[in-house]
Amino acid sequence: YFTDLAIAEVKRIENLISDWIPTTQISLVNKNAGIQAVRVDSEVYELVERAIKISQLTEGAFDISYASMDKIWKFDGSMTVMPTEVAIKKSVAKIGYKNIILNKEDQTIFLKLEGMKLGLGGIGQGYIADKVKTVLLTNGCSSGIVNVSGDINAWGKQSNQKPWTVGIVNPMNKNKVFATFPLENSSVETSGNYEKYVIFNGIRYSHIIDPRTGYPATGIVSVSVFAKQTEIADALATGIFVLGVEVGLDLVNQLKGIECIIVDDKGKIHSSKGIDIKKYTK
């Protein structure tokens, strides 16, 4: 019963916000880029509004208009030379959350530039995890854990009355779990580049691309963000990955109720102020 409810909710949201389903409201917004504003449901409007707030917070390191990017980097081994600087610059010309125009009164979204596109992948999975939890809680599911491709939201306790736990791995050390954290009515999202990357001149370029420059993020192999809402953890993990270790930690340390663990490309582990990593390390 709960599984059916969860699946129905996932489908409902996908049919609202997926940019790869041509009939969704987000696809309609994308089709009308540079042409006209599109009225959307309040749910879609508010999600986009929150996404823009995270763009402001991360100074554009997280940006839902990243879907406008030309896919010039290939991470399947087929790319033998680095793209040119001109191509890289051109690839991000249409990205920019400041060109997403929201009109609260009409509840419309307008993309200023023709060819601009929204993609809610970096926040949508977290949003789905939160909404599934809400649906299950409302229908009497007093404890559970939802995992939407790595975005995890847990509430209540396991059947043995112990809290749910999540293991954090170090990708640079044979994916060994180095710390286990209890998840008590909270969520975690891990973003990693250890599966998809290319190396040029000894620099490891990850598949997570900085929407501001068009260059892949470097310096980090994994980011785990803990927050009450999976949506926030999801978007911030991407943003921190792009911002890098110092700026990323600095940002998280200013945010209430949010913590993170970063593994850099040397395998070193960094954590935000509120996490005493020694307490949870194996």
Locate predicted features:
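Mature catalytic core of soluble alpha/beta enzymes
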Residues: 1-282
